[in-house]
Amino acid sequence: MCGYERMIDEIDQQIISLLQDDARLSNAVIAEKVGLKSSSVFDRVKKMERKGIIKGYVALVDAELVDKPIVAFIRLSVGSVSEDYLESKRSVEDICAAEPDVLECHAVAGEDCYVLKVRAVNPKELEKLIERIRCNAPVTRSTTSIVLSTVKETAKVFPG
């Protein structure tokens, strides 16, 4: 396989898929579904946790029900390539990491340098968030798109 060793097999993928659907499933239930003993499932899950394949377990929250209904994507540019470029990128990344309303920050290729996924209580709070980012980071351009509706949103790597 050209020096590439698979980190997980098909059974691990099935286990991950089941945990992505319901992280509270017991090892016994998972074992029954994948055809293993409960102890084998336990060992496989622990191994995937140690390797960092399974990074953690989270509760999926309906953001609208906790008063964060506004979703937006912000595209940022930090200027042209220069000696300050890497420092500018680090500054943007530090600000995004510290900002609780920034859910995701992706360095991208193309016209922009970053794409952020953010949530806000209302348009005014979104505006304040954009101002905080623009005022504290060396951003040369930002473009914001507010989400009208979400057709698909998932964190699943292996569909079930």
Enumerate the language-model features and the residues they cover.
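A compositional/biophysical signature of low hydrophobicity enriched in polar/charged and small residues
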Residues: 1-160
